[in-house]
Each structure stands twice: as C-alpha cells, then as structure tokens.
Amino acid sequence: MERPVKDGIIYVQHCKFGKRTWRKIRAQLFAASPFGVARMEKFDARDHGTVSDISLQRCARRVIRLSDCVSVGPMGTESCPKATAAFYLTTTEKNYVLAAEQRDEWIEQLCQLAFQGKKEAEQSSSTGLQPIPMEENCLYSSWQDLTEFPVLVLRTEAAARCELHGHYVLAALPHSLTLKDAQSQQPLLTWPYPFLRKFGQDQNIFSFEAGRRSDSGEGTFTFSTPRAAELCRAVAAAIACQQQGQESPQPSAQGLSNQPWGAEAEDPQCSPTLGRAHSGSHSASYPSLNLLRFPPVEPEAPAPIVYASIARGQQPHFRPCPGQPLPEHLYENIFTAQPRPLAEEEAEEEEGRWELGCRQAPEGHSSEAAVPYPARSAPQPHTQRWAPGGSRGGAEEPSRPKPQRTLRAKLVRLLSRDGPGARDWS
C-alpha cells in the first residue's frame, strides 16, 4: 500500500457570488511509484480536523496530477485563516490558492514531486547524447581461466564406469585434458593427447574417445558446456602444437628405432601391428609406437619373372653386336646371340656333359635324368678335357649336331648357376 509523503490540513479558497471563502480540506502528497503517479489527493474535513469515514469520503476525493503542475509558489493575501500562509498551485487546467500553517514545507514537497523528475529527465536529455555504438569483446572473461571450461557430464558407459556425474571443470592443458572438481579444483582424471583417439563438438556438446592406455580406460566421454566450440578449438590447437614439437626425433624414439625388429622391420606397414600387439605390456611412460617416425622407404621395383632374372645375370656372356639394343630375357639371349668360335662351343659342350653327369637319376629311379639341382659343391672331375683342336685322347665320341649341343649346354649352364627351384620347371 502506498504511503503519503506529506499529510495535513490545508485551506482552499473559493469564489462564490463574488465573495472569497476558505474551505478546510485534508491533503495528501504521493510520490511516483510502481503503484501510482505523483499526485495530490484532497478530502473534505470536519471542524475537528479529522477525515470522515472512508466509505463516505470516496466520492468527495479529488485528485490533482502533479505532472500537470505548471508552477508553485508563495503569495500574499490580505485575509487568510488564522496562523496560516497562502501559496498558489497552477496546473494546466486550473489555478488553486491554498493556505497552510507549514507553507514552506508544502511548497518544497510539491516542487520536489512535480519538477524534480522533470528536471532530471531534462538534464539527461540535454547532456546525454546518443550512445556511441560499441561491440562486445569476445575475449572478456577475466573472471576465469581461458583454458578451463565448466562442464556437465552426460551419462555414457565410460562415465558410469568412472562414476562421473554432475558438474566439473575440464581444463585443456598444453599436454593433456584434465578433469577437475568444481569446488576443490583437484584433478580427478587426466587424458594425454596421444591417448585420445578422436574428439569433436556439436552445438553445446563436446565429446572425445579415450584409448585403452588412459587412466579412465577405453570409452567415450560426453560433456555439455556453452563453450563447446571454444573447448574444441583449444584441444585442436594443443594437439597441433604438440605435433609440431615432435617433428624433431626424440631421444626415446631414437632408442626404440635402433632396436632390431626382425623380419617385420623391412616392411614399414608392420609398425602399427607391432604397436597394437605390445600395447598392453608397455607402461604409460613409454611413447606409443605409432608416434615413431621411420624414414620413408623408397618403393622397390616389382619383382621380375624368373627368366628375366636369369637373363640379367647372364647378359655379360651374351653381348649383341655393336649398335643393337640389349636383349630382354634369356630366350632372346640364346637365339639372338652372335655365334662364337668353334673351340669355345666345344668347351661349353664338355662342361655341360660334366654337369649333366652330376645330375644322374637317383638310385631306384627309372628315368634317365632327374630334375637338375645345383651341384656347385661337387668336386671337379679329373677327366681329360678337350684339346684346343677339338680332340682328346682315346676313342672319340660320336658327333652330334652342333647347334643343338650348343643350345642345350647353354641352357644347362645358365640354369645351374642361378639355381632355379622345381617351381620354375612346372
């Protein structure tokens, strides 16, 4: 209920039939409030100066809005009620002549209620120009650290296993993500960035998947925070900074790279498999094998076919004539090679016969000759060799067509040097 600022008995002057009279009233001054405007309320008063019954005086109440007041001030009159002084109140609708025992107090209260609010409004309008357009500073967050984000843990299987629920503080430190207690700021869980498989953000949700080597174990953790985008950018920046710092080889990585890895070390794709196989036995202090930087291996040429390998090994023995391109494989070497002197051909034929002799069929085998296997460790036979003239002591062997003997001798000698397996003859 509103309380009046000023309450008392005053007199109002009336003119009736050209004669001025004073009528006693009770006046109350109310200031502007959420319940009403600044005003003066008048009630009829009896001779003893008290207000009559409210139910009877409701119809006799008069209201003067002080917002319509134009001027207030004292005035001198010849006749006023006893022990009173006159003052005037001018509004936009009517002029009032009033008298009161405490005239100065009534004038002061009327001026304060009627003109003080207008004066303040005029001063603000005269001195206050239009506000200068300003932009919000997105970096203004001095009340908390930029790397700490208040989060709400959402229920997941990993969060339930770690008994996480409620509000926490997630700090994106240079080397790890740390979950702290919201009250005591004590670190509860730590996830190093190398142990995070993946992370992401969607509106007000930040989520990441932890690996098996982290303190919390394998699983997905989801947090709700209004600064999810900022948190995701902070984690990405920290990972990028840490990755740039690892471009130079670390001492621990160098020590591991010098260890013999076995046959799998030749294949660069074997490193991730080896890291996954031994991840459970390595402690958290050892760096992940996936982080080791192996030097790039130059791609090797595709393995050639068998006869192409044989041809490369025997090309110095079969050189084409000047101006002709090198042959591609063995068969071209054999059939396109330039014939050599007869003495050399006969020597090769003798050597082919000796090598065939070392490859006789095993005991109990019915075939004439077995599959030719290398016999380099066999001792050299002490038999008579061909003379330079193509003859030897003793009975002469029946002659054969030389082109066929030359071709067979070359085939046997070439294949015996490279030692092809049984799969090359299938």
UniProtKB/Swiss-Prot annotation:
GO cellular component: cytoplasm; plasma membrane
Skewed-composition ranges (Basic residues): 402-411
Keywords from the named record: Cell membrane, Cytoplasm, Membrane, Phosphoprotein
Region (Disordered): 243-282, 357-426
Domain PH: 4-115
Any single GO BP term: cell surface receptor protein tyrosine kinase signaling pathway
Matches recorded under Pfam families: IRS
PANTHER family per UniProt: DOCKING PROTEIN 3, DOCKING PROTEIN RELATED
Family that this chain belongs to: Belongs to the DOK family. Type A subfamily.
This protein's name: Docking protein 3
Source organism per UniProt: Gallus gallus
Lineage: Eukaryota, Metazoa, Chordata, Craniata, Vertebrata
